[in-house]
Swiss-Prot record:
Record's miscellaneous remark: Is regarded as an important allergen. On the 2D-gel the determined pI of this protein is: 4.20, its MW is: 11.20 kDa.
Alphabetized Gene3D superfamilies for the sequence: EF-hand
Domain EF-hand stretches: 26-61
An annotated GO cellular component: cytoplasm
Protein name stated in the entry: Parvalbumin beta 3
Species of provenance: Merluccius gayi
Amino acid sequence: AFSGILAEADIAAALKACEAADSFNYKAFFAKKAFFVIDQDKSGFIEEDELKLFLQVFSAGARALTDAETKAFLK
């Protein structure tokens, strides 16, 4: 999904940095271009369910965000 936008090494490093629950820092991870990929239903909004699966946009095997991480992302 991010082919041509982010390098595979950058994606792997970012996922490695937030493997542990409650370690996801959206300010360090989020980029404007990512919005259009995360907005899976192309509604122009990113819903909570789309945020929970945010890391899986980068890699299908990545974990879902915790409720706390999702709420922090929404702030």
